């Protein structure tokens, strides 16, 4: 499951708020090279871990925008809003579309995909089976569909397809899990679902809990994660100034595959390309010695022609 960046402790955070180190922070800073006076767009600002570091370099708060669809995250960024940063409480595609319509362009753009550590660590958000909570998994509580809705309404075939496609689960295991879910419905809790999956397929030789892939699939479906990435990518060149840099941190192969394909298309487009891709291979999260939770992360970046 993907783990996003999080900041050094801010006076705006409650003492009970989980504190985390931003993923690949030094690498993103070195590749995207923010300098004083540049404008910054963070499409997944979270609790401001990357944003604060980038804004410290640019010192251009008035022309910078931070986006997140999680209300809790937006609330913790109030100190940056007081300095002039624009906060947008929307998903990154809706925000990007609005900014394109406004004719806004930026020198540096960052998107750090996936679920954040505070989301995982709050039982009531329902992202993790480490805590017993409702099967929610919504990054934006304003949306209607929850993981419980999917678990308790999808057919065996639809659940099998979902777990196979988005969870990258073996087809046979996915079908057994789907059949067990339908038979056991209604299912409302995270540990209830995780225990059911473990009882159904066992742990075997797997490094991770046998429910990990199913939980990933449900989260992706609830939040339309891959569809939003596909919609975002072609908007990025329209949001960059000439010479502007965009970086994207992904956490699993489904995300990285979409980004790699788009960047490869740009690299092969010749004079029609809108972006230059300096490095074909992504930077791996294993290079981030400061944050062991980032080991599954990959970072790709491009420059506007």
Regions found by a protein language model. Give the residues of each.
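S-adenosyl-L-methionine-dependent methyltransferase catalytic core, i.e., the SAM/SAH-binding region
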Residues: 1-305
